[in-house]
């Protein structure tokens, strides 16, 4: 199965999710509308208020964590709270130093520059970013060969917000230049059910509390997945029932979509069962595991594993991956004695 084809894949997916009007409506605009991530929200309120009181641009910010948790949304909220414009791009798009220079020179004082997948910046672009972040200056080379010379352009004070799913992949010099590091965690069921209810309200979709909770339980702690499942369950409710989503309707729809009580799909179960059946519960190395299930090691490491580890189904040890007691219980398999 291709990772991007999964219904519970946390990256943006499909033409429906590219519908900007719906996407904008479902996103919170201000911190008071933002659900979950309580510590992060509390910190941001203080940092934003302090910057506003001093009349300064907010310090540069690095937002990291698994995909689908709201890094882009949070960047937009920061710009809204500061009352400034936001310009968005991504690391792979900025191929040349001139690409970044064009963005920086068009910023107004206090503006936010948001770079998604910042860990994928090229080294050439990254070198340009250092003086821009530290001194609000841009070093430009004029001419070629022996006649080449460097000139400095002053930039207005701005806030760089970088987002990444792989904070460890950032170079140390770049990471050190972010004054505000923020890690986003998987959402609990209570917060996620509130997000589901809010999104259903935006879509004018009737849903009761138990239906929202059932959707939240199977959404892997990820708002993007919760909103995607909500749309699919809506289709089921409109065709098979009277359009209203309750626990029974959500159960039937999600079972039909092959998403179990823990939010696992075929790929998750394949990974866990490979460790249990093919490697006797582990430990198993990442390369062997990738070969056994026919996936790239990066897909396992960055996409499948984080939620399974966080929920206690897999342990990552120096010797390899191990299936936990909880994994055996999930499949009603008796764990062998070792």
Curated annotation (Swiss-Prot):
GO BP of this protein: DNA recombination; DNA repair
Gene Ontology cellular-component terms listed: cytoplasm; Holliday junction resolvase complex
Residues involved in ATP binding: 27, 68, 71-73, 134-136, 177, 187, 224
Transmembrane segments: none
Binding site for Mg(2+): 72
Sequence segments annotated as region (Large ATPase domain (RuvB-L)): 4-187
Binding site for DNA: 297, 316, 321
Top-rank taxon, per record: Bacteria
Region of interest called Small ATPAse domain (RuvB-S), as start-end residue ranges on this chain: 188-258
Region (Head domain (RuvB-H)): 261-338
A molecular function GO annotation: ATP hydrolysis activity
EC code: 3.6.4.-
Keyword field contains DNA repair: yes
Localisation per UniProt entry: Cytoplasm
Catalytic activity as recorded in UniProt: ATP + H2O = ADP + phosphate + H(+)
InterPro entries linked to this entry: AAA+_ATPase, AAA_lid_4, DNA_helicase_Holl-junc_RuvB, P-loop_NTPase, RuvB-like_N, RuvB_C, WH-like_DNA-bd_sf, WH_DNA-bd_sf
Enzyme class of the recorded protein, top EC level: hydrolase
Keywords, comma-separated and alphabetical: ATP-binding, Cytoplasm, DNA damage, DNA recombination, DNA repair, DNA-binding, Hydrolase, Nucleotide-binding
Region (Disordered): 1-22
Function: The RuvA-RuvB-RuvC complex processes Holliday junction (HJ) DNA during genetic recombination and DNA repair, while the RuvA-RuvB complex plays an important role in the rescue of blocked DNA replication forks via replication fork reversal (RFR). RuvA specifically binds to HJ cruciform DNA, conferring on it an open structure. The RuvB hexamer acts as an ATP-dependent pump, pulling dsDNA into and through the RuvAB complex. RuvB forms 2 homohexamers on either side of HJ DNA bound by 1 or 2 RuvA tetramers; 4 subunits per hexamer contact DNA at a time.
Quaternary state and interactors: Homohexamer. Forms an RuvA(8)-RuvB(12)-Holliday junction (HJ) complex. HJ DNA is sandwiched between 2 RuvA tetramers; dsDNA enters through RuvA and exits via RuvB. An RuvB hexamer assembles on each DNA strand where it exits the tetramer. Each RuvB hexamer is contacted by two RuvA subunits (via domain III) on 2 adjacent RuvB subunits; this complex drives branch migration. In the full resolvosome a probable DNA-RuvA(4)-RuvB(12)-RuvC(2) complex forms which resolves the HJ.
Family: Belongs to the RuvB family.
PANTHER family documented for this protein: HOLLIDAY JUNCTION BRANCH MIGRATION COMPLEX SUBUNIT RUVB, PTHR42848
Domain observations: Has 3 domains, the large (RuvB-L) and small ATPase (RuvB-S) domains and the C-terminal head (RuvB-H) domain. The head domain binds DNA, while the ATPase domains jointly bind ATP, ADP or are empty depending on the state of the subunit in the translocation cycle. During a single DNA translocation step the structure of each domain remains the same, but their relative positions change.
Name of the protein this chain belongs to: Holliday junction branch migration complex subunit RuvB
Naturally occurring in which organism (per UniProt): Shewanella sediminis (strain HAW-EB3)
């Amino acid at each position: 199965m291709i990772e991007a084809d999964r219904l519970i894949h946390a990256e943006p997916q499909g033409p429906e999710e590219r519908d900007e009007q719906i996407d904008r409506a479902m996103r919170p605009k201000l911190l008071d509308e933002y659900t979950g991530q309580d510590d992060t929200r509390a910190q941001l309120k203080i940092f934003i208020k302090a910057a506003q009181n001093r009349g300064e641009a907010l310090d540069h910010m690095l937002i990291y964590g698994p995909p689908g948790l709201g890094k882009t949304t949070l960047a937009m909220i920061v710009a809204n709270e500061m009352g400034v414009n936001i310009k968005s791009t991504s690391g792979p798009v900025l191929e040349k130093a001139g690409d970044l220079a064009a963005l920086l020179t068009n910023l107004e004082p206090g503006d936010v520059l948001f770079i998604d997948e910042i860990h994928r910046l090229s080294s050439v672009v990254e070198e340009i970013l250092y003086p821009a972040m530290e001194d609000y200056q841009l070093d430009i080379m004029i001419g070629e060969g022996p006649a080449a010379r460097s000139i400095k352009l002053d930039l207005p004070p701005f806030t760089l917000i970088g987002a990444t799913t792989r904070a460890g992949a950032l170079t140390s010099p770049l990471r050190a230049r972010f004054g505000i590091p923020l890690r986003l965690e998987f959402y609990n069921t209570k917060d996620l059910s509130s997000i589901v209810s809010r999104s259903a309200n935006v879509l004018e979709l009737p849903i009761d509390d138990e239906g929202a909770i059932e959707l939240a339980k199977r959404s892997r702690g990820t708002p993007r997945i919760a909103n995607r499942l909500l749309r699919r369950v809506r289709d089921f409710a409109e065709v098979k029932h009277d359009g209203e989503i309750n626990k029974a309707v959500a159960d039937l729809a999600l079972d039909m979509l092959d998403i179990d009580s823990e939010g696992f799909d075929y790929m998750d179960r394949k990974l866990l069962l490979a460790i249990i059946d093919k490697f006797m519960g582990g430990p198993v190395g990442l390369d062997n595991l990738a070969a056994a299930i026919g996936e790239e090691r990066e897909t396992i490491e960055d996409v499948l594993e984080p939620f399974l580890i966080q929920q206690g189904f897999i342990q990552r040890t120096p010797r390899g991956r191990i299936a936990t007691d909880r994994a055996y219980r999930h499949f009603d398999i008796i764990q062998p004695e070792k």
